[in-house]
Amino acid sequence: MNRQQFLIDAGLEVQTLEFWIEQQWLVPDESTQEISFSDTDVARAHLIRDLKGDFGVNDEGIDVILHLVDQLHGLRRAFEELHKDIASSPR
């Protein structure tokens, strides 16, 4: 989705989005002329907004939490691949 649609879906202001991209909390796809965002980016923006607004997490805390979330997703993918390999190997 384009930047304008992302801002609407994520409920963000332009300045907030620019700061979050600068902090690398959001990493949009810049492979085309216009940057684009995914549904995952929207979900991540909602998480950041909730952490900051509802829970009062500061910027350093957001960095730590997002790093841990990214590690968990990476481990999940690794376990899924391992499970596929085990399931497809002859017994």
Task: Show which residues each predicted segment covers.
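Short glycine/proline-centered loop/turn elements that form peptide/ligand docking sites
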Residues: F6, L12-F19
